[in-house]
């Protein structure tokens, strides 16, 4: 509990800005769309809701809740397979897997998937053992929500289907239950499919454009880079078990069905990404696998003889305590001193509060109307928007299609505020039309903002331009 509280509080206290994925998700969720140009919508809806309820700390609370819920599902599954003490240890030792610690300071679609993966696996285990209608219906809803969170959940769904077909559980497909669950999952996912159709498959077009912009010569060696990253992710867990002489490969303590289930569901999805990368020679992002490994600790603890486990519990907890203390200390030090050590700000070191205050003060000295939207440099725009008292909409500079809630008519009626780093003005949708509009008053200027986290760095110089409807101008 103390660990989770620290990881909720320390980023709020020690960082001066959000990491990239947090303000991006918040501004998406602010618009309550059925989809966005990078991802499906569910994660952003939840993130924005926590931001509205809990304020600036909301994303950090949500992220740790996702990790904690993942641990709960691992415990529930483990308690069906091993003793309850072992299940508890297996659950808390998920925190000895790197992906479930450091990356969680940045809530994103990977973190959002973690409890969904663990929950789906647990529900599937219950289905295999009880085959009730209620379980299949819950599975369908959660699978649909998973697909609304990130498309990579399809790897888990594929693994579940494959496992059922390769084992005696294939008889389940002879009943109506899995087919109804499939239809229910598609029903939950269908609003996003309709949105994709209406927006010319925007998300897939974005993914394609990103892949075309990168060099993708066939290179099977990138698969081993991915594999090495995954193995290194388990090092804290493996080291703790080795130091306590608790790393065993004894498969006699599990019945065959449970053993097959654990190993397949716990390892195959991550290995599947390796196989795809090896065959296609494409670079799989390491973090795509982050929700896939929640059962690894349960697998390893299930192999420990009960007598050995009973003798080593205290040492195991001590090892975990050392690891969690160390990673928490490193996290806090990085947030507080990282920019000074590197002489370069990370995304967490930007003067978000000052940027936001400058925008608000500047706008309200010129306009009597609320600031409806902000645009310009994407990073600066989302930083400013997500720290304001009344959050405005954000319009991406990249393409009109990336911000379908913004139209020329809205901009002409409400105006806009544009900001960018000096000398780096991006191409901004509709800007040329706004500059010709006689009903808008155009003001511009420049700010110089110090880097509190990197005091020796030259100040951040921001240029801005405001388009204010004439009926809103201060007299």
Q: What positions do the PLM features span?
A:
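Extracytoplasmic catalytic/substrate-binding loops of multi-pass membrane glycan-assembly enzymes
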Residues: 10-25, 34-49, 53-58, 65, ...
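Hydrophobic/aromatic-rich transmembrane helices and adjacent perimembrane loops
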Residues: 31-32, 260, 267, 281-312, ...
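Transmembrane-helix motifs of polytopic, lipid-linked glycan transferases
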Residues: 57, 61-85, 118-123
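Short acidic/glycine- and proline-prone juxtamembrane loop motifs at membrane-interface regions
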Residues: 102-113
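Membrane-interface transmembrane helices that cradle and orient dolichyl/undecaprenyl
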Residues: 120-135
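Transmembrane-lumen/periplasm boundary regions of multi-pass, lipid-linked membrane glycan transferases
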Residues: 157-258, 269-275, 279
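Membrane-proximal, lumen/periplasm-facing interface regions of secretory-pathway glyco-
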Residues: 281-282, 286, 311-370, 377-395, ...
